[in-house]
């Protein structure tokens, strides 16, 4: 019986790395992006990230500085349907699991110095992740695996209503990016850029799993040989991760009177995350099943290459519009391995149908010399598959809306303020062996997202 406990408890844990190993590339590094979204052809201070080659076309020589603060809030929902949930709850076979991810303050800084045809620029930002996600009531994969394995190994004699499963998991991830580069205006219509970004990852996950017989059934636990008569399995884990990598960046900007074209390519950054395991307390669990969480173990988590192309056009002296395209080559960025339904193990990126495509558009209007209003739209398609999606790491195709304003306080000082909202398309994953239990089940994944941003800009 104890052998069964080892196997089931280990199965519950093998998906933990996918939570910390997956991340988002943050393109919102300035409130100007939040209020207009399509900023890849902008010639402004936020171009340090969105269009660095275009900085050479800035009219003012000297220093430009921008300090940004953003506040982001997300929810993640899993509507799980599994037949054993009905036995445990006595109601129906579905359960709703909800997690929250918040980042009250996401800072970023952008600065540059322009002299003649040359511009040197630098930035600091949280270029990936940026918050903490908490699932206080655990995840369906943990509950379903425990129920399925216990039912199978005891031939149904130990049923879900005889024990409690308590799980909780917190995960956090931050990728701090420091960027430095040079822009040069070759002639009146062409400028180029070369630079790089140093990425430092820090994050990890902390959680526990406890499966215990209820008080009315402790006698059964004693017959099973459980030390305290009730604990089937227990895991208490605290694992931190760190890693770093370099992203080379090149860009070009082509300016033809009212038309401007911005191009940028960010190369893949090879990133390996190293475990710093501070706690691994186990009861009825063989340590070898948690070998991936031992101190010093490395997991691939590359930052994918990215290509952006944008076209901006000045319709009127006071009205401008832009369209933009992004491609993230996720299929060639190393990720942790996942186990397929047939039992084989493959690198997670290979399960994607294609890399990420993003389509962006935006407009801004100078109502007066002091006030500019703007809005934008973004559509994101990830190329998701059932094998890529897990409870601990899932994404949903989406569209986003942003709007806001710039207030020119003086010739030197200005403020950008914006709100950014995302609608996600629900993703339904159905399987004949729900989380390896041999029973049919399904998950419906959904998310929400909203971001507030404020940037203070200064030039001299």
Residue ranges, per PLM feature:
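Sec-dependent N-terminal signal peptides
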Residues: 4-14
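Residues in and immediately flanking transmembrane alpha helices
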Residues: 15-16, 64, 210, 382
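Outer-membrane beta-barrel porins/channels
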Residues: 21-38, 43, 106-108, 112-460
């Amino acid at each position: 019986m104890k052998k069964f406990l080892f196997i089931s408890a280990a199965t519950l844990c093998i998906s933990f790395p996918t939570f910390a190993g997956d991340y988002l590339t943050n393109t919102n590094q300035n409130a100007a992006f939040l209020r207009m979204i399509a900023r890849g052809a902008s010639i402004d201070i936020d171009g340090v990230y969105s269009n660095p080659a275009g900085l050479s076309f800035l009219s003012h020589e000297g220093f430009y500085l921008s300090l940004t603060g953003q506040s982001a809030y997300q929810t993640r929902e899993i509507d799980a349907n599994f037949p054993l949930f009905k036995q445990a709850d006595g109601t129906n076979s579905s359960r709703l699991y909800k997690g929250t991810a918040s980042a009250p303050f996401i800072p970023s800084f952008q600065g540059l110095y322009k002299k003649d045809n040359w511009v040197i620029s630098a930035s600091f930002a949280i270029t990936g992740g940026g918050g903490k996600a908490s699932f206080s009531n655990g995840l369906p994969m943990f509950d379903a695996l425990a129920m399925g394995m216990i039912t199978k190994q005891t031939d149904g004699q130990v049923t879900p209503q005889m024990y409690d499963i308590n799980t909780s998991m917190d995960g956090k991830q931050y990728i701090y990016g420091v960027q430095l580069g040079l822009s040069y205006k070759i002639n009146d219509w062409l400028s180029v850029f070369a630079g790089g970004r140093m990425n430092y990852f820090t994050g990890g996950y902390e959680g526990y799993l406890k499966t215990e017989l209820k008080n009315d059934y402790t006698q059964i636990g004693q017959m099973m040989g459980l030390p305290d008569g009730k604990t089937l399995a227990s895991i208490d884990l605290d694992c931190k991760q760190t890693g770093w990598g370099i992203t080379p960046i090149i860009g070009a900007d082509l300016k033809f009177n009212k038309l401007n074209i911005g191009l940028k390519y960010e190369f893949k950054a090879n990133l390996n995350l190293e475990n710093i395991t501070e706690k691994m307390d186990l009861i009825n669990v063989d340590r070898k099943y948690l070998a991936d969480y031992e101190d010093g173990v490395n997991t691939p988590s590359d930052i994918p290459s990215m290509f952006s192309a944008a076209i901006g056009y000045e319709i009127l002296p006071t009205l401008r519009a832009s369209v933009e395209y992004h491609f993230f080559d996720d299929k060639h960025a190393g990720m942790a391995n996942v186990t397929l339904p047939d039992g084989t193990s493959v690198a997670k990126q290979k399960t994607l149908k294609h890399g990420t495509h993003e389509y962006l558009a935006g407009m801004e209007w100078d109502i007066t010399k002091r006030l500019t209003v703007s809005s934008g739209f973004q559509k994101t398609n990830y190329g998701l598959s059932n094998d890529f999606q897990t409870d601990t790491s899932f994404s949903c195709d989406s569209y986003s809306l942003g709007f806001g304003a710039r207030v020119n306080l003086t010739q030197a000082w200005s403020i950008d303020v914006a709100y950014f909202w995302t609608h996600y398309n629900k993703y339904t994953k159905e399987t004949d062996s729900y989380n390896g239990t041999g029973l049919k089940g399904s998950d419906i994944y959904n998310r929400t997202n909203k971001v507030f941003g404020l940037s203070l800009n200064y030039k001299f």
